[in-house]
């Protein structure tokens, strides 16, 4: 697919992220956008209706999607992709990360729309994966059975390998300051981590590359709200 253009400048088709409590970090991320973006899609998992983000100057369209109860990280990321189905690629990023100067321009220049693209980022490349349309076409979306977070990336990497999707390393850099040391996070994650790890190991043992999908029982059992 041809690059999106405004004048003679290419556009990043979609930047998307989910947020839940730290709107200050979400605003830091938005403030780091230094290259034209067509659609900025935010899924607000907080259920509080207390935050109204302002559209950054370099963004054409801001979409702030509020839900009464959280979709989890990959439920939100799947929604971002499904709601912008004509994009050649999607830049999905954790809300506790932010773009280094020039990162978005580098992404637009180097991205492979047939691959899963990674940038240089602290902690884990999965804090800012860039999904090409070819990757999504061949491997599908995240399995929302892994609610609300963790082992979703392990499962997706296993599935894209099985589907023959290439992983490409870009030279762009994104900064990341994980919030995983928060006490409330640690307490909630201690329970759901085990459930998701067991689910992942069962899929491996059964040679299962399918997408189990969202489940009402899993959502309620793994609740953080």
State the predicted function of each range.
Residues 133-150, 159-170:
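Aromatic-glycine-rich donor-binding/catalytic loop that engages nucleotide-sugar donors
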Residues 34-66:
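Acidic donor-binding segment of Leloir-type glycosyltransferases
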Residues 154-225:
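C-terminal catalytic/acceptor-binding lobe
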Residues 102-120:
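Conserved donor-nucleotide/metal-binding helix-loop-beta segment in metal-dependent transferases, i.e.
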Residues 21-35:
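Short, well-formed alpha-helical segments that are part of the catalytic scaffolds
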Residues 117-129:
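Short beta-strand-to-loop element that shapes/binds the nucleotide-sugar donor at the catalytic cleft/hinge
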Residues 87-98:
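Short beta-strand-to-loop acidic/aromatic patch adjacent to the donor-nucleotide binding site
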């Amino acid at each position: 697919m041809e690059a999106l253009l405004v004048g003679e400048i290419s556009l990043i088709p979609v930047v998307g992220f989910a947020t839940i409590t730290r709107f200050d970090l979400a605003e830091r991320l938005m403030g780091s956008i230094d290259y034209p973006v067509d659609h900025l899609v935010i899924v607000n998992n907080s259920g509080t209706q207390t935050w109204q983000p302002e559209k950054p100057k370099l963004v054409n369209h801001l979409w702030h999607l509020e839900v009464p109860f959280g979709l989890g990280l990959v439920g939100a990321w799947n929604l971002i992709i499904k709601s912008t189905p004509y994009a050649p690629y999607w830049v999905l990023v954790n809300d506790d990360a932010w773009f280094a100067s020039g990162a978005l321009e580098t992404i637009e220049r180097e991205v492979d729309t047939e691959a899963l693209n990674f940038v240089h980022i602290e902690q884990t490349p999965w804090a800012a994966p860039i999904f090409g349309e070819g990757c999504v076409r061949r491997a599908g979306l995240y399995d929302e059975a892994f609610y609300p977070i963790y082992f979703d990336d392990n499962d997706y990497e296993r599935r894209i390998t099985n589907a023959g999707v290439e992983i490409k390393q870009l030279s762009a850099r994104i900064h990341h300051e994980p919030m995983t040391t928060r006490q409330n996070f640690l307490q909630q994650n201690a329970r759901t981590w085990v459930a998701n790890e067991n689910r992942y190991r069962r899929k491996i043992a059964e040679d299962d590359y399918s997408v189990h999908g969202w489940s009402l029982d899993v959502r309620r059992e793994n609740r953080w709200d």
